[in-house]
Design a protein with these regions (language model features):
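Cofactor-binding active-site loop characterized by glycine-rich and histidine/acidic residues
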Residues: 9-21, 25-42, 48-179, 200
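Conserved acidic/glycine
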Residues: 1-60, 163, 167-168, 185, ...
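Short internal beta-strands
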Residues: 71-75, 183-191
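Short glycine-/polar-rich loops that comprise or flank the Walker A/P-loop
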Residues: 153, 180-184, 215
Length: 388
């Protein structure tokens, strides 16, 4: 199993919160399917890999970016991540964490009417969650112009890359009035997997051109700090071009390789392969494995830098490169979309994250660094829950 911990070099304590969010979202789904009595033996629900690809993005938003007037539409399969964050913020009672997809319990898709914790937009059918904040922005502008007091704030959509196959998405993007809505920010979870396959020909550059042509600001978060550092070394330019030119299935296969296998496969057979070989042969095994996974959508600093570039005079799309299942033993596997961790894999993950499977719902100490960060946004969060 090759699953280095996420953001090993990220500043504490935000990285600890990120790890805890990954654990909580995974544990909720594990409990619903493997712990709670289930006479039928059928899968109850939940998508651990889809949650994992969103953990860094949502951690960086909730614990460093969002303000009280902001609203967020969360991609449907990332609902357990939202529940985990709300739990850490004190907005969800522990008793609900064992109720995912139970009658009267937590929903597997965010629901304003059924979930007990704060949800800005109900999402479910693909495409709806992406576009709903556009209509929310229009409604807020109308209320403010007519009655006043509607407040201000950005409208974020967290979008799975496969949702961009939906025609309704592009109907909204191309609407001329949307180009004037600077409060709209979409963050695309570009993990290049759809259902149980690796999408072979997904072209991020084409998506960038389509958004740009509609008048949107396009920000691409492709690589994390480790890879960016390696690119500055001898052989780094060749490594960068090799990764950029690599077909999606080949890249996904590298995620399931040992360090020695990565050293063998990664250089390829181009003229500058020897330069790549020399570069990665100087790295220890842990660094080799971390480097091949070091995409921008899992780098908290890279995401923070992207948010700082948002232009509030026009809509923005942030295309964040991610790995489906990042941090899990199943990361990058082409059939991990609806798969569940085995009990053994779950215990391995617990050990990697420093968690006790017998006490899965532990919060941070209130007076510790991570606990204080969780408490800081709470007053603003309570205010936004009751505002328009």
């Amino acid at each position: 199993v090759n699953s280095p911990s996420i953001n090993q070099n990220a500043p504490e304590p935000l990285a600890e919160i990120e790890k805890r969010v990954l654990w909580l979202s995974t544990a909720m789904i594990h409990h619903a399917n493997r712990v709670r009595p289930n006479p039928s033996g059928l899968k109850v629900g939940g998508h651990q890999a889809s949650c994992a690809s969103m953990v860094s993005i949502m951690t960086s938003l909730w614990f460093g970016q969002l303000r009280s007037g902001d609203r967020v539409s969360v991609k449907p399969h990332a609902a357990p991540v939202l529940h985990g964050i709300n739990y850490l913020l004190g907005e969800l009672d522990e008793s609900y964490l064992t109720t995912l997809r139970e009658f009267g319990g937590l929903q597997s898709y965010p629901s304003r009417s059924k979930d007990p914790d704060p949800v800005d937009y109900s999402t479910g059918s693909v495409g709806i969650g992406a576009t709903t904040p556009i209509w929310g922005a229009i409604a807020r502008r109308y209320v403010d112009a007519s009655l006043g007091g509607a407040g201000t704030g950005r409208q974020y959509s967290l979008v799975g890359d496969a949702e961009l196959d939906e025609g309704a998405v592009w109907e909204a993007v191309l609407d001329h009035s949307v180009a004037e809505q600077g409060e709209i920010v979409w963050i695309v979870d570009l993990n290049r997997q759809s259902l149980d396959r690796v999408v072979p020909n997904i072209a991020a550059t084409r998506l960038e051109r389509m958004f740009s042509g509609a008048g949107w600001q396009v920000i691409t978060v492709k690589f994390g700090a480790l890879l960016e550092s390696l690119f500055t070394r001898p052989g780094g330019t060749a490594l960068r071009e090799r990764i950029l030119d690599m077909p999606n299935p080949e890249y996904q296969r590298l995620l399931r390789c040992t360090a020695d296998e990565v050293r063998l496969r990664l250089p390829g057979d181009a003229a500058d392969a020897d330069a790549i070989t020399s570069l990665i042969n100087d790295l220890d095994d842990a660094t080799v494995l971390e480097a091949i996974r070091n995409l921008g959508g899992h780098d908290l600093d890279a995401l923070r830098e992207a948010y700082a570039q948002i232009d509030d005079t026009r809509p923005t799309v942030i295309i964040a490169y991610t790995i489906k299942g990042r941090g899990l033993p199943t990361q990058g596997h082409p059939q991990n979309h609806s798969s569940l961790l085995t009990t053994e894999q779950y215990e391995i993950l617990a050990a990697e994250l420093g968690m006790d499977p017998s006490k899965p719902w532990e919060r941070f100490e209130a007076d510790g660094p991570s606990g204080r960060i969780c408490a800081e946004p709470l007053s603003a969060w309570l205010a936004r829950r009751w505002s328009i």
